Swiss-Prot record:
Keyword Nucleotidyltransferase attributed: yes
Highest taxon listed in the record's lineage: Bacteria
InterPro entries xrefs: GalP_uridyl_Trfase_II, GalP_uridyl_Trfase_II_CS, GalP_Utransf_C, GalP_Utransf_N
Transferase as UniProt keyword: yes
GO MF terms, alphabetically ordered: UDP-glucose:hexose-1-phosphate uridylyltransferase activity
Pathway(s) the chain acts in: Carbohydrate metabolism; galactose metabolism
GO annotation, cellular component aspect: cytoplasm
Lineage: Bacteria, Bacillati, Bacillota, Bacilli, Bacillales
Designated name of the protein: Galactose-1-phosphate uridylyltransferase
Single GO biological process annotation from the record: galactose metabolic process
Amino acid sequence: MSIIEHLEQLLEYGLERKLISIWDREYTRNRLYEALGITHPEPNSSTSIKQSQSLPDLLAPIYKWAAETGRMEADTDTYRDLLSAKLMGCFVPAPSEVIRKFEETKALYGPKQATKEFYQYSEDVYYIRTDRIAKNVHWTVPTEYGELEMTINLSKPEKDPKAIAAAKEQEQTNYPMCLLCKENVGFEGSVNHPARQNHRIIPVILEDEQWFLQFSPYVYYPEHCIVLKGEHEPMEISKKTFERLLSFLGQYPHYFIGSNADLPIVGGSILSHDHFQGGAHDFPMARAEAEDVYELNDYPGVSLGLVKWPMSVLRLQGDEPGHVAEAADHIFRTWQTYSDEKAGIAAYTGDTPHNTVTPIARRRGDLYELDIVLRNNRTDEEHPLGIFHPHQEVHHIKKENIGLIEVMGLAILPGRLQEEMKETAAALCSADPKTALEQNPLTAKHSEWALRTMEKRTITKENVDLVIKEELGHVFARILEHAGVFKQTAEGKQAFRRFIDQLGAKPVKSLNR
């Protein structure tokens, strides 16, 4: 099949998905020719799309042709991503038209339908690459804190050597300033920065400020969205943060929304641009119950719950978002300066602050619910990466920061674990597991953990994969306990209640009494 016929199939896909109308066919065809540098197309016989062909299958022969004819540097993930965004950008109308359609759907059918359609649209134009996301491995594990969700992340492509070399040669630029800036919309991209011709964002007003809604190209849960500030300003938790989160819920009540903490170690991977993450998912933490419920003396109509969770979580509920934001700010300001030597909590080292929060908001019927997760980023000699961070004993599984998504009970584990766990399973079923584990460079770092697992579990060839997945879930629960500022011990729970006393809270009921 010729390149012209492959492009005709891509046009048919666009028509079938209603990305373009029949009146856009010639215009879009010419844009595709321009994108590929085709100046003298040969006449073609119209080719109808095979219904079984997915978008990645339609794009594959175009990549091959582009690489063979010098239109693409190399047939690798980096260059394929740049070309696919350029090609699919030919099907995407101006931002104003995407916004108009979104707002029209929202007005006629409500925000839930509008976000659902916009999500589908983001998939159809290949901004969300479902073929990549499908590679991720998912499972759940029951624990004392409820069922935790586990993911091995295989969706982010590795940079190929050619692209890495090209990136070193390329002139550094500050446009767009980061991956979240609104200037990414329609951006051509480079080996250093993803192409975004097929990317669109929806304006949202939060507390009289301009923010934007988009979806994450690396979806970790249903309708995983990012809400970003219009201006490139750093992450900062304040009363305004709580007000913005609750304002968003007023407009999109079917989503949860949360913010990463604003300090290194306990924050997310991007601290330079203020943003939230949300979506249509009920996380394990949201399903966790409050062990104790309190009234706050100065905030009538707002209840405070101590959540049964490995991290230290206070749950506010109220029907007035303004009152909930006031109570959240009270907790935050109290925590910012709170120290408890017996619990190992120090608010400051000199002038350097350590205490902050990870806030997560959702609607619960008519109520506004705001979880305040207490965080501290202090380090010491024993824990140079963070005292309330995954400890050395679990680094063979994960040593990265515990951000918003993991705080809520969804583990995002590194892709290396897929092969390492496969090798670990084989070693555990071998004649000499200890030697097999210790001599294999892929499993040596897991050997102590794997041998301990063997001592407490009966392992067979039939159940080894399940046992490993369950034990990874238990490691994740322990990682969350490490990140918790008040520990799951009698002393830790007592220390947590000392902090609650500082808030002026009065007990109402307890599941423990």
